[in-house]
UniProtKB/Swiss-Prot annotation:
The keyword Magnesium does not apply. It catalyses: Hydrolysis of (1->3)-beta-D-glucosidic linkages in (1->3)-beta-D-glucans. Its main location: membrane. The keyword Hydrolase applies. It is an enzyme of class 3 (hydrolase). This is Probable glucan endo-1,3-beta-glucosidase eglC. Glycans are attached at residues 84, 183, 312. It comes from Aspergillus oryzae (strain ATCC 42149 / RIB 40) (Yellow koji mold). The lineage of its organism: Eukaryota, Fungi, Dikarya, Ascomycota, Pezizomycotina. The gene is eglC. Residues 1-18 form the signal peptide. Residues 317-354, 396-430 are annotated as: Disordered. GO terms for molecular function: glucan endo-1,3-beta-D-glucosidase activity.
Length: 463
């Protein structure tokens, strides 16, 4: 009887502490049409049953607002309840629409109650707002952003709203580029959040040597820089990926083979170890953007475009994950910004022409441009010492390349534009152990889980 209880306890620890693994989901399709609840349900079901995987059961959203409405909760919420898919919520903080985002959050809490609350693993307040508000972001028309003071105020407001509700223990974070996180003027945001969201795209680091063979080192370097300023708080990987098709960015070639390599070398070590939201399940419905990051094509199918299986050799060892749990926590991604404006209802981002009830911005880091437009690609810190990358756009606006800025050692992978069907990613990780446990577990506790399992089975061996 004692043995049975010990084994059950060990297994419950392993189950409860598993890292979240999912995709980013925009509020609209690639043609700008608004997604319905059934659309989200189909996507969530497909993600859970992808051939070669154990299932991607979490979804990162860019906005709380359903497309075509002023402040009604996004239909991804009832879809997630129906499909038992966990949620990393996103509130678009720039452009003057925060009041409507907060109204939608309040409505979701009252309308869906505990069935909704139990699925929420985190809340991201804004995405890449700090980058867009920077001088470098303004130079490339990255879109409307906000500074650290306003962002901290919004974070406090969200904490106040969820206090005393079923979401009171949910960790709150913000998603931005590593250059924004490492800019000392933004340190107040790090102090205000429970976790930091990171997005990184080596493919778009076109001012550097960014071939697929360099991708893992570029990604790891940018994550390390973010963790170095995180003050011990978790970094969640909220957005990263490699395109299956599209234009070439310096040495970065979009192809199925390279997307598979990036999945193996960057994704597989993260999955089940670090909270990770990949970019993206599908971005080619009904039109295919340039570049396209979807692991499935224009037709939603559980059969992916390339092999998604992860061999044991691509995963960190149990001892490595336990000893490096703090450094291996996922990093988040950031919200859209770039050359093409998107509608938040579809991607979580909206153009300046869209009412302030939906986020307004253009494609930039961490965001995929709508349709064929590409993001303003992020590269490295500017030569002037600014922590923000410089970008130049092509005349067509369909693609952009970053200007040379900073040495390669100062550069790390960041984000890029995405299709309008997706919105910019946000991410986070709970820093406090209480927050982590409250949300069902995070990568930082993987070491303690492993230790508990070892202790239990060692004890069993003595019986």
């Amino acid at each position: 009887m004692q043995l049975t209880h010990l084994l059950a306890f060990a297994l419950s620890l392993a189950t409860s502490e598993a890292a979240y693994k999912g995709f980013n989901y925009g509020a609209t399709k690639s043609d700008g049409s608004v997604k319905s609840q059934s659309d989200f349900e189909s996507e969530f079901s497909t993600a859970k049953n992808l051939v070669g995987t154990s299932g991607f059961t979490s979804a990162r959203l860019y906005t709380m607002i359903q497309g075509g409405t002023t402040n009604s909760p996004i239909s991804a919420i009832p879809a997630a309840i129906a499909e038992n898919t966990s949620l990393l919520l996103g509130l678009w903080a720039s452009g003057g629409g925060m009041d409507n985002e907060l109204a939608a959050l309040k409505s979701a809490i009252s309308q869906y109650g505990d069935s909704f609350a139990k699925l929420v693993v985190g809340i991201s307040v804004g995405s890449e707002d700090l980058y867009r508000a920077s001088s470098e972001g303004e130079k490339v028309n990255a879109g409307i952003g906000i500074g650290p003071d306003d962002l901290v105020s919004f974070i406090k407001e969200v904490r106040s709203i969820i206090s005393g509700t079923a979401l009171s223990s949910v960790p709150i974070g913000h998603v931005d580029t590593w250059t924004a996180w490492t800019n000392g003027s933004n340190s107040a945001v790090i102090d205000a959040v429970d976790w930091l969201g990171f997005d990184g795209y080596p493919y778009f680091q076109s001012s550097m040597s960014n071939s697929i063979s360099d991708a893992k080192s570029l990604f790891d370097d940018s994550v390390a820089k973010t963790k170095a300023v995180a003050k011990g708080k978790e970094v969640w990987i909220t957005e990263t990926g490699w395109p299956v098709s599209g234009s070439t960015q310096n040495l970065g070639v979009a192809s199925l083979a390279n997307a598979k390599t990036y999945w193996d070398e960057v994704g597989c070590p993260l999955f089940d170890e670090t909270n990770t939201w990949w970019y993206i399940l599908q971005d080619a419905n009904p039109t295919t953007p340039n570049p396209s990051f979807g692991v499935v094509g224009s037709t939603l199918s559980t059969t992916p475009l390339f092999d998604l299986s992860c061999s044991n050799s691509t995963r960190p060892s149990a001892s490595a994950s336990s000893s490096a749990a703090g450094s291996a926590t996922p990093v988040g991604s950031a919200v859209p910004s770039g050359s093409a404006a998107v509608n938040p209802s579809s991607s979580g981002i909206v153009s300046s022409a869209v009412p302030s009830t939906t986020p307004g911005f253009t494609v930039g880091k961490g965001f995929r441009p709508s349709n064929s437009s590409a993001a303003a690609y992020y590269s490295s810190a500017s030569a002037s010492g600014s922590a923000y990358p410089k970008f130049t756009k092509t005349a067509s606006g369909s693609s952009a390349t970053s200007t040379t800025a900073g040495s390669s050692s100062d550069s790390s992978s960041t984000n890029s534009g995405k299709s309008s069907s997706e919105s910019s990613s946000t991410n986070s990780g709970a820093s406090a152990s209480s927050s982590i446990l409250a949300t069902g577990g995070a990568s930082s506790v993987s070491g303690s889980v492993f230790g508990a399992l070892v202790a239990v089975f060692a004890f069993v061996a003595t019986l």
